[in-house]
Curated annotation (Swiss-Prot):
Low complexity bias locations: 298-312
Keyword Chloroplast assigned: no
Gene Ontology MF annotations: acetyl-CoA carboxylase activity; ATP binding; carboxyl- or carbamoyltransferase activity
Enzymatic reactions: N(6)-carboxybiotinyl-L-lysyl-[protein] + acetyl-CoA = N(6)-biotinyl-L-lysyl-[protein] + malonyl-CoA
Domain CoA carboxyltransferase N-terminal per the UniProt entry, residue ranges: 24-293
UniProt-listed Enzyme Commission number(s): 2.1.3.15
Domain of life: Bacteria
Annotated gene: accD
Protein's name in the database: Acetyl-coenzyme A carboxylase carboxyl transferase subunit beta
């Protein structure tokens, strides 16, 4: 009995054991309900029921925007990974390596070129999972390159902003990306091409103070945090209590800071419609299905026809 208990049973358990993924379930920050990860992923990372918009990765975002989930990844300029040899509790170079291994991205911004309901567009997406989507030299170069490509292709440029601000580990070099991206936006404007900004949760700091507030149209996702400094910092500075919902998308819409708040499921058709309106392009006409005609009547050969008695 001891042999069965001590030897055989543990081996059987090891054979039958299955590792449970860490992200099998997601807890909704709004309602607290546990939701199966695959269900959230299939719903574009919107929690069913509460409609809470989770953060969405760059690749998933591009996949949800482009026709047939296909696009061309835009080659981005390489930059010095650690120009200041910065170190706090850890080396900045090590933080970059960890972020790249975790996200599969080179830096916080991914740029793609493809079709949005038949129209060529350039889309840049900030991924908050990569060091908080912070704006550094590489991210700035990516935004500038995306704007340059939009001018080359005479295409609209759409950016999905998600950032905590400038990347402190790069000092003044990260702050320089604010005027650089602003100049690049002006280049797009001089080419008379549309620039649409989608502000996701969160859009703060130096990103808000530069290209994220320079669009022809500003769209926000429901519940997105949008602002420059944090609410607690503002309260401590002005020594006043801020109104409820301050810096949230709906509050900014009520006060004229954004043009519309759009559910994630409606973003794709909304962006396509805006691009067509701003470029004065005709609407895409989808072919109508051919009408269902009744089957032709069966013809009867003379030899197969039944004999009919002559009438008197």
């Amino acid at each position: 009995m001891n042999w069965l208990t001590n030897v055989v049973r543990p081996k059987i358990r090891n054979i039958l054991r299955r590792e449970t993924p860490e992200n099998l379930w997601i807890k909704c920050p709004d309602s607290g309900q546990l939701v199966f990860y695959k269900d959230v992923e299939a719903n574009q990372f919107v929690i069913p029921g509460s409609n809470y918009h989770m953060r969405m990765g760059a690749t998933a975002r591009l996949k949800s925007m482009f026709d047939n989930e296909t696009w061309f990844d835009v080659a981005l300029p390489e930059v010095t990974p650690d120009p200041l040899k910065f170190r706090d509790e850890r080396r900045y170079a090590d933080r970059i390596k960890d972020a790249r291994a975790r996200t599969g991205m080179n830096d916080a911004v991914k740029v793609g070129f493809g079709k949005l309901e038949g129209m060529g567009v350039v889309i840049a997406v900030q991924d908050f999972d990569f060091m908080g989507g912070s704006l550094g030299m590489a991210a700035g170069e990516a935004i500038v390159r995306g704007l340059e490509l939009a001018v080359e292709k005479t295409s609209p440029f759409i950016v999905f902003a998600a950032s905590g601000g400038a990347r402190m580990q790069e000092g003044i070099l990260s702050l320089m990306q604010m005027p650089r991206t602003t100049v690049a936006v002006q280049m797009l404007r001089e080419a008379k091409l549309p620039y649409i900004v989608v502000q996701t949760n969160p859009t703060t700091g130096g990103v808000t103070a530069s290209y994220a507030m320079l669009g022809d149209v500003h769209i926000a996702e429901p519940g997105a945090l949008i602002g420059f400094a944090g609410a607690r910092v503002i309260e401590q500075t002005i020594r006043e209590k801020l109104p409820e919902g301050f810096q949230r998308a709906e509050y900014l819409l009520d006060h004229g800071m954004v043009d519309m708040v759009v559910h994630r499921h409606d973003l794709r058709p909304t962006l396509a419609r805006l691009c067509r309106l701003l470029t004065k392009s005709p609407a895409v006409e989808h072919p109508k299905p051919a009408p269902q005609l009744p089957p032709p009547a069966k013809t009867v050969e003379a030899a197969d026809a039944p004999a009919v008695a002559p009438t008197a």
